[in-house]
């Protein structure tokens, strides 16, 4: 049989499994791929067993080693990319670095245990890094005889979610057994199909990158005699068109306005550049020395320059090439945003004396000059050009 063409007509959604160690995240991932392959066979829906998912390859993302398994599958309505990380540290790194941007996640909780410390931590991380939609899968229900006990566990999970500002009373909770489904028990297979229908319905279709407001981090600037100033870089999101009014944001206190008079890619003139394109944009009314690497070109009003923010950060271990020693309050490294380094100072949370390599922590940062940042912007922490940490902006303060 000929391979089916990749069907782009289906909306694409990124999800993942989160939850405490040994609660069944990887078994559930295997069960989803296997049950979909049995019930909705297609070239995309191929069963993956536990061992192949668990043996996730090491990836390096911004200098950090992360083990992550990527699987894909489809329902009748959607195409999914699903991430599953074997170790707790891999989840923390994945979420904080933005390596795995999830539109929603399935929180797996073993009914035999109820919520555990990493359940709480993954919920908090989801809240911090902007994973807005969680669905709960209460796993291993076949091992619990007592209906009341299941109700108590469900209440406990809902309360915990509400504590972190998720709609704990309303979000879907599905009770099943990933292992039984994997083994082919049709009752539990049906529950996996219910779970996927719920994911289809409950996790909204993500906004496409091209529908978001323009953001183009400036990498290089040059002037063309008689035509003006060109800024080049890779469009992070949105679309840039000839005659667009744009703003140049960051480094300087004030925002500058300009008009795009040309867009080119590979030396060819274009009408527009899209998210993901490497383009040069010709700007009217901007001198060569008025724009620099580290600034961004953005849709007017969509992003502002800031110097103070809260962030969730992961500090690399010595083995990852990070620091060998802890750091303390008022530590002053460089913060690398998109294309440039800016010095800033770190304030640790009350009661935290120091941060050890391998820790993740919420910090307050004050930069020496403003950068275009917003909730969800990722950054690296660097010392003398080497990466010692990775983080994400969770709250703007000034």
Curated annotation (Swiss-Prot):
Region (G2): 63-67
HAMAP family: EF_Tu_B (MF_00118_B)
Domain of life: Bacteria
GO CC entries: cytosol
Name of the protein this chain belongs to: Elongation factor Tu
Segments of this protein annotated with the region G3: 84-87
Region of interest: G1: 19-26
């Amino acid at each position: 049989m000929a391979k089916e063409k990749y069907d782009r007509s289906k909306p694409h959604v990124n999800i993942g499994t989160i939850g405490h160690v040994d609660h069944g995240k990887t078994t559930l991932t295997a069960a989803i791929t296997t049950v979909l392959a049995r019930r909705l066979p297609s070239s995309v829906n191929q069963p993956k067993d536990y061992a192949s998912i668990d043996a996730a390859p090491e990836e390096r993302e911004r200098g950090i080693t992360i083990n992550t398994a990527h699987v894909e599958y489809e329902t009748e309505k959607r195409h999914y990319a699903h991430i599953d990380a074997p170790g707790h540290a891999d989840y923390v790194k994945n979420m904080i670095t933005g390596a795995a941007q999830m539109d929603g996640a399935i929180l797996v909780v073993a009914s035999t245990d109820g919520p555990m410390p990493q359940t709480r931590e993954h919920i908090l991380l989801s809240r911090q890094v902007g994973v807005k939609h969680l669905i709960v899968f209460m796993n291993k229900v076949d091992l619990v005889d007592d209906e009341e006990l299941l109700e108590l566990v469900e209440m406990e999970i809902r309360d915990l979610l509400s504590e972190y500002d998720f709609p704990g009373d309303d979000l879907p909770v599905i009770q099943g057994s990933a292992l039984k489904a994997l083994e082919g028990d049709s009752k539990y297979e049906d529950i996996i199909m219910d779970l996927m229908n719920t994911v289809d319905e409950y996790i909204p279709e993500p906004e496409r990158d091209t529908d978001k407001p323009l953001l183009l981090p400036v990498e290089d600037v040059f002037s063309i005699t008689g035509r003006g100033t060109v800024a080049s870089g890779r469009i992070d999101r949105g679309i840039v068109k000839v005659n667009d009014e744009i703003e140049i944001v960051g480094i300087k206190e004030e925002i500058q306005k300009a008009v795009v008079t040309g867009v080119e890619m590979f030396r060819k003139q274009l009408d527009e550049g899209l998210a993901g394109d490497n383009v040069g944009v010709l700007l009217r009314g901007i001198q060569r020395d008025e724009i620099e690497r580290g600034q961004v070109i953005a849709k007017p009003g969509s992003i502002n320059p800031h110097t103070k923010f809260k962030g969730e950060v992961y500090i690399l271990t010595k083995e990852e090439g990070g620091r060998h020693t802890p750091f303390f309050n008022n530590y002053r490294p460089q913060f690398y945003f998109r294309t440039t380094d800016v010095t800033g100072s770190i304030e640790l949370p009350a009661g935290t004396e120091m941060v050890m390599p391998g820790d993740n922590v919420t910090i307050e940062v004050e930069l020496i000059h403003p950068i275009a940042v917003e909730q969800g912007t990722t950054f690296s922490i660097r010392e003398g050009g080497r990466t010692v940490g990775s983080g994400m902006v969770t709250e703007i303060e000034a």
